Amino acid sequence: MTIADNKKAFFDYFIEERYEAGMALEGWEVKAIRANRAQIKEGYVVIRNAELFLIGAHISPLQSASTHVHPDPVRTRKLLLHAEEIKKLIGKVEQRGYTLVPLNLHYTRGRVKCEIGLAKGKKQFDKRETEKDRDWQREKARLMREKA
């Protein structure tokens, strides 16, 4: 079940590979995510000391959160992957001009997971071409409905 999607990632990047990563979350974050208070549109993934971190994702705390916990909505969250996957990602990101972007948050067997994509940035003309294709598909569907 999908919690939050990053639709902007598909507009700004060519997604070449996808990986499912676990997330190191605090209790208040899990509660807030279950209440659909997560947003990853401005999030991005960085590599530090051979570890992956999700930066810029916003999880709004619930008002009923504990008084002794001071929630930070945009804190850096560690992503959990197998060592071989991390090494592979590090190699591609450092050498070939790829970047890592969060694609969505979802549940897998009751756990919150983040799907990250190995992506290459689109140029402005690529974005325009994608927009034209999308418009044509929409127009084609409309014409088919009118004929039927």
Curated annotation (Swiss-Prot):
Q: Which PROSITE patterns match?
A: SSRP
> Which controlled-vocabulary keywords does the entry list?
Cytoplasm, RNA-binding
Q: Does the keyword Metal-binding apply?
A: no
Major subcellular location class: cytoplasm
Please give the superkingdom of this protein's source.
Bacteria
RNA-binding: present as a keyword of the record? yes
**Single GO molecular-function term?**
RNA binding
GO BP term (any one): trans-translation
Q: Where is this region: Disordered?
A: 124-148
Location in or out of the cell? Cytoplasm
Cellular component, GO, one term: cytosol
Specify one Pfam family: SmpB
Question: Where does the record locate the signal sequence feature?
Answer: none
Task: Give the matching InterPro entries.
Answer: SmpB, SsrA-bd_prot, SsrA-bd_prot_CS
Question: Do you know which SUPFAM superfamilies this protein is assigned to?
Answer: Small protein B (SmpB)
CDD domains named in the record = SmpB
Protein family? Belongs to the SmpB family.
Question: Which purpose does this protein serve, as stated in its record?
Answer: Required for rescue of stalled ribosomes mediated by trans-translation. Binds to transfer-messenger RNA (tmRNA), required for stable association of tmRNA with ribosomes. tmRNA and SmpB together mimic tRNA shape, replacing the anticodon stem-loop with SmpB. tmRNA is encoded by the ssrA gene; the 2 termini fold to resemble tRNA(Ala) and it encodes a 'tag peptide', a short internal open reading frame. During trans-translation Ala-aminoacylated tmRNA acts like a tRNA, entering the A-site of stalled ribosomes, displacing the stalled mRNA.
Q: Which PANTHER family match?
A: SSRA-BINDING PROTEIN, TMRNA-BINDING COMPONENT OF TRANS-TRANSLATION TAGGING COMPLEX
What name appears for this protein in its UniProt entry?
A: SsrA-binding protein
Q: Which organism is it from?
A: Ralstonia pickettii (strain 12J)
